[in-house]
Amino acid sequence: MPTTVRVTKRFTFDMAHALYGYDGPCKNIHGHTYHLSVTVAGVINQQEGHPELGLVVDFGELKEITKKVILLEYDHALVLKNDAPYSKDGFLPDHFEKVLLVPFQPSCENL
């Protein structure tokens, strides 16, 4: 029976957010450096002649998927809750390139 192996690729990106309605300093716009670990579990490819022989996943493909799904959207973005008053007047989205309005409180736990 083949053994399942886990491989992990780590990514680092910077993002700003504000916690609307929070009674503390994090209600203000501030930023963090995030460390994202993407883990893929699978069986090592043992098919002779296959270009991915010996691999669970092609790290180049994993990097591209992570870039498309997460990094292009969140890296150097300002993330705000979509029902916060400052997200409705159009000022932030109109004056900054990467403002992402989300339907949840953009805390580290929710992200």
Language-model features and meaning:
Residues 1-111:
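Charge-rich, low-complexity N-terminal segments
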